[in-house]
């Protein structure tokens, strides 16, 4: 479903980079044996990401989950200030303000100190938030910069293929991802739709390599720079052993192949759920397979809860999101709306065992059209941190009862019409 075919030129260039990176994607088989001894179901998910999508799972990685942008941001600044060798950043939206201003000041300083600073931003995501050809301005400051898939004044389906990832890698051993873009509303420095609820995760250790691979893949497709990737490995600038608990597997999704990785990860988690499944998503625009999986989970006794916004950022998309409520609710799925405002987080947690935190919305664009990323977590402390955040968020949210779902004929008609255009929204 959806367009999974960006330009042939971009596809060819990324495939060339992938050939160079192939030897750096090897899976430690002893880790697979360990996981198989614990849980064969989780092993299937892990092997899918490792064998088919080529993102290995790692131990020796410490994770820290952030339940808000304002908790994530100071730690991000602190880690940026520690950079000694390189900083890689890949973001969908950059908007001038306090958040980007504080980060940019550090990036300029680090570039002057000889740190390799590279920045990728999506040209469409930042179309209305950055000056035209902003990358030239950053290059003058010593920051290597590329705008992904530049917007052109012609109608093209390729414009749908956006880089929706949020990745920060510092010296190969520290990484960040999640839903947080580089704009003030994400840290509640500026109010747009009530309180802005978002989440992020920091990795320290070997699993950061998968985030680095994602960045290097697109960067070198746009600007061929690297032939030797050894210096970007986690242990290159951190020869000491890493601490860690549990298993960590960052993964990417792209419209370059026929694998709907983001959707498959979600489906695997939903289908394996036995006790509970909690999910955050700003948009709930899903296909029949996802609807069936969620409904079946609820029907077999799983406590399925989904949190969407109370105050939307896009009213038409929100109306479409609400059109899915009744079918899910009738099957036993509990729908909540985040009362304080807008929830932009993209998380799923299940049975105190597994969770995923990343950039992937439950909508057609994220699942089929965009470059995305997430982190699959198994038996880490962060899994329970996501669960606790979900419980606290649900307490602040409004449970959508059948009474609240009642609406008039014309709204039902409008939602039915919107459903026809769901893949475009």
Per-segment meaning from a language model:
Residues 92, 282-283, 317:
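Glycine- and other small-residue-rich loops at beta-strand/loop junctions that grip anionic moieties
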Residues 273, 283-304, 309, 314:
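Helical hairpin unit composed of two closely spaced alpha helices linked by a short loop
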């Amino acid at each position: 479903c959806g367009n999974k075919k960006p330009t042939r030129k971009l596809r060819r260039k990324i495939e060339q980079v992938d050939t160079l990176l192939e030897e750096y994607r090897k899976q430690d088989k002893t880790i697979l044996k360990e996981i198989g001894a614990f849980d064969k179901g989780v092993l299937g998910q892990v092997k899918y990401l490792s064998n088919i999508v080529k993102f290995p799972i790692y131990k020796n990685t410490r994770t820290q989950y952030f339940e808000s942008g304002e908790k994530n941001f100071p730690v991000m600044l602190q880690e940026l200030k520690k950079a000694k060798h390189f900083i890689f950043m890949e973001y969908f939206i950059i908007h001038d303000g306090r958040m980007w201003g504080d980060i940019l000041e550090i990036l300029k300083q680090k570039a002057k100190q000889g740190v390799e600073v590279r920045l990728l931003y999506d040209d469409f995501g930042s179309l209305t938030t950055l000056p035209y050809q902003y990358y030239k301005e950053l290059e003058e400051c010593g920051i290597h910069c590329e705008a992904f898939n530049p917007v052109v004044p012609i109608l093209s389906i390729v414009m749908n293929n956006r880089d929706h990832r949020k990745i920060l890698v510092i010296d190969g051993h520290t990484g960040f991802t999640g839903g947080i873009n580089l704009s003030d509303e994400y840290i509640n420095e500026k109010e747009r739709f009530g309180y802005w609820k978002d989440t992020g995760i920091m990795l320290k250790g070997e699993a950061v390599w998968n985030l680095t691979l994602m960045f290097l893949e697109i960067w070198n497709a746009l600007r061929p720079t690297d032939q030797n990737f050894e210096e970007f490995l986690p242990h290159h600038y951190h020869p000491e052993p890493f601490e860690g608990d549990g298993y960590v597997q960052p993964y990417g999704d792209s419209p370059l192949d026929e694998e709907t990785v983001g959707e498959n990860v979600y489906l695997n988690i939903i289908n394996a759920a036995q006790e509970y499944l909690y999910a955050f998503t700003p948009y709930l625009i899903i296909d029949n397979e996802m609807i069936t999986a969620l409904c079946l989970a609820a029907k077999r006794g799983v406590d399925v809860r989904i949190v969407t916004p109370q105050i939307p950022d896009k009213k038409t998309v929100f109306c479409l999101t609400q059109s899915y409520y009744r079918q899910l609710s009738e099957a036993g799925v509990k729908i909540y709306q985040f009362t304080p405002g807008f929830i932009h987080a993209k998380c799923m947690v299940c049975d105190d065992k597994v969770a995923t935190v990343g950039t992937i919305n439950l909508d057609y664009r994220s699942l089929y059209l965009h470059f995305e990323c997430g982190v699959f977590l198994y038996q880490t402390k962060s899994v329970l941190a996501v669960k606790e955040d979900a419980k606290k968020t649900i307490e602040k949210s409004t449970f959508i009862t059948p009474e609240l779902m009642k609406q008039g004929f014309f709204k039902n008609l409008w939602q039915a019409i919107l459903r026809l255009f769901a893949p475009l929204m």
